[in-house]
Design a protein with these regions (language model features):
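N-terminal amphipathic/basic-hydrophobic helices that include classical n-h-c signal peptides
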Residues: 1-25
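Short boundary motifs at domain starts and secondary-structure transition points
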Residues: 6, 19-22, 97-102, 143, ...
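Acidic, glycine-enriched catalytic cores built around paired aspartates
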Residues: 22-76, 84-94, 104, 303-305, ...
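Structured, charged N-terminal subsegments at the starts of enzyme catalytic cores
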Residues: 73-155, 159-163, 170
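Well-ordered, non-membrane alpha-helical segments in soluble/globular domains
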Residues: 82-94, 124-138, 164-178, 216-222, ...
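Core alpha/beta catalytic barrel or barrel-like domain that forms the active/cofactor pocket
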Residues: 105-114, 142-160, 182-208, 228-247, ...
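Structural alpha-beta junctions
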Residues: 134-147, 174-180, 229, 259-273, ...
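A cross-taxonomic marker for long C-terminal extensions/tails that follow the last structured domain
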Residues: 210-213, 221-294, 309-360
């Protein structure tokens, strides 16, 4: 595509504005659309049930223009990385993006591989960073002024400030910095090619494991040290910690990190904007269009919430639009104080029992996981193999598939490990996590009390704590799934898994 057609016959006159992240007080998004494949129903614009690269271009436009999200996370890990997403969006949807400036009114935020963990995809990080100035040039031609459509990247599995500083420094020294290099004839790269902008990018740490969550504020503080930043975004996972440590542990770890971020903000004077990665299953966050106020009230201190594929595509569009509007308008709360040591003691006991029960089910989980349908053509990030150290060399599916497999067996993963908690523990947890009863009730609805995979101790403890209202339709479908597995007739197993997921309105 000849990029000149994007200018609308408007001459490009550079308007040099201060676009260094953290210096300009830009509008921080409240609602981040992501590419997590937890949906049952494919979106209407998809050519196939599994979304491919061009579908994701259409998706970004759809969530901006129709659903009302103010940010799209773009995953740069996997087989079909598209470093021309900005050019494609501005080319295909010119009228919309002329009225809505990408990088100011709306954000496209890239999720990059972490070379410390994902060695096989490490060089994709460099390719992605190199694409940022090209996207800047494309947008500047389109808007007729300096425009930075991408100026932040998300680093998954952040475990140290060094991981963040390496990316920040690489961009400054090798992407931006190459313009100062001199060629053999004495001409600089800048004179030959032009400027490389934006001048700087910022890195959003994504904390996904136990240690990362407990040290999130410390790591962020070290990254801020020596930088002239007025604001910083930070990202807390909710899904992978649930898979690794159980739902209650994940929620409590989020609470600790949010409380620590509040303290860091006060000490550093840098405004922090925490993002929480929420799915629709209670296990992965329980964020749906109909309970936005409950969840945002539960996660006081969080500023931005993710809406994943199930939120967007498994509900009526009018409900989704209302839910997103609420997400964007609700006033952020202040993170409360946390009794850290008491919380950590509960996490330790609960996590041990949760992992023991997962180990008992690992074979059946992996067997069912093979039949859980995919919803994206490319894989997302490699992620944490949370059981490889403490539970032997056990391989488990990713969190969405893991969740879908257990729900299909009538064993919502939210219930695992619950029997490790005393009545005193539960009273204390409810002070920190007031929505515990609600989340368990939402999950237990899809349990099958007759499932051979639901342990009697979990069932009895649960029924003492809440009064489950089992969904008869879902119970019947899980009975068919269990019967098919028992007699090894799996021809229609995927169809049954989708039927159960449709009844829940989320895949996993």
């Amino acid at each position: 595509v000849n990029i000149q057609i994007l200018v609308y016959h408007q001459p490009y006159i550079p308007v040099h504005r201060n676009i260094i992240p953290g210096v300009l007080n830009m509008k921080v998004p409240r609602c981040m659309s992501t590419q997590h494949p937890d949906n049952v129903n494919p979106p209407f614009f998809a050519e196939e049930p599994e979304l491919g690269g061009e579908d994701e271009i259409r998706e970004a436009y759809y969530v901006f223009s129709h659903l009302g999200c103010d940010e799209q996370m773009w995953d740069c890990e996997g087989k079909e990385v598209d470093n021309y997403v900005v050019k494609k969006l501005l080319t295909k949807y010119q009228a919309f993006f002329q009225d809505h400036v990408l990088g100011e009114d709306l954000r496209l935020t890239l999720r990059v591989p972490n070379p410390t963990v994902e060695r096989a995809e490490a060089k994709i990080l460099l390719e992605t960073l190199e694409s940022i100035p090209r996207s800047y040039d494309t947008a500047s031609l389109f808007y007729g002024m300096d425009a930075a459509p991408v100026f932040e990247v998300i680093l998954p599995m952040t475990s140290s400030s060094s991981c963040l500083n390496r990316i920040h420094s690489y961009y400054l020294d090798f992407v931006k910095g190459k313009e100062r290099l001199q060629l053999a004839d004495g001409v600089t790269v800048k004179e030959w090619i032009g400027e490389f902008r934006p001048d700087e990018i910022n890195v959003i740490p994504l904390f996904e494991d136990h240690e990362g969550m407990l040290n999130a504020a410390k790591i962020t503080g070290e990254y801020l040290d020596g930088k002239d930043l007025m604001e910083q975004r930070v990202f807390l996972a909710r899904s992978d910690p649930a898979m690794n440590y159980g739902m209650i542990s994940a929620t409590l770890l989020n609470r600790i990190a949010l409380s620590d971020f509040r303290d860091l903000e006060e000490e550093s004077g840098v405004k922090l904007y925490p993002i929480i990665g929420m799915g629709s299953a209670p296990f992965r966050g329980n964020l749906r269009p109909d309970n936005v106020e409950d969840v945002t009230g539960e996660y006081r201190g969080a500023y931005t919430f993710t809406v994943q594929s199930s939120f967007k595509y498994d509900h009526e569009p009018s409900e989704v639009i209302r839910g997103i509007k609420k997400l964007r308008s609700v006033k952020p709360g202040r993170a409360p104080e946390i009794e850290r040591e008491s919380v950590l003691e509960i996490i330790s006991a609960y996590c041990r029992e949760y992992r023991r029960q997962v180990m008992d089910l690992v074979d059946i989980i992996n067997r069912v996981a093979r039949y859980v349908p995919g919803r994206r053509k490319r894989k997302l990030h490699i992620g944490l193999f949370g059981y490889s150290r403490s539970m032997g060399n056990v391989s488990l599916p990713r969190a969405i598939t893991f969740t879908a497999a257990l729900y299909s067996l009538g064993v919502p993963p939210e219930l695992l490990g619950f029997n490790a908690l005393s009545s005193g523990d539960l009273e204390f947890i409810e002070e920190v996590y007031p929505g515990l009863r609600r989340d368990l009730h939402d999950a237990a609805r899809y349990a099958n009390p007759e499932s051979p995979f639901l342990s009697p101790e979990v069932k009895s403890t649960l029924e003492e704590y809440i009064e489950p209202e089992y969904d008869e339709g879902h119970m019947k479908t899980t009975e068919e799934i269990i019967r098919a597995l028992r007699i090894n007739r799996t021809a229609n197993l995927q169809e049954l898994i989708l039927e159960a997921a449709s009844q829940r309105k989320f895949l996993g």
